């Protein structure tokens, strides 16, 4: 995932 991802497809970080 672009911006931030744990590899499971979830998002976290400055880009939601």
UniProtKB/Swiss-Prot annotation:
The modification Leucine amide is found at residue 16. GO terms for cellular component: extracellular region. GO terms for biological process: neuropeptide signaling pathway. It comes from the Eukaryota. GO terms for molecular function: neuropeptide hormone activity. Its main location: secreted. It is found in: Secreted. Keywords: Amidation, Neuropeptide, Secreted. PROSITE patterns: PYROKININ (PS00539). Belongs to the pyrokinin family. Myoactive. This is CAPA-Pyrokinin. The lineage of its organism: Eukaryota, Metazoa, Ecdysozoa, Arthropoda, Hexapoda.
């Amino acid at each position: 995932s672009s911006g931030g991802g744990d590899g499971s497809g979830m998002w976290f970080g400055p880009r939601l």
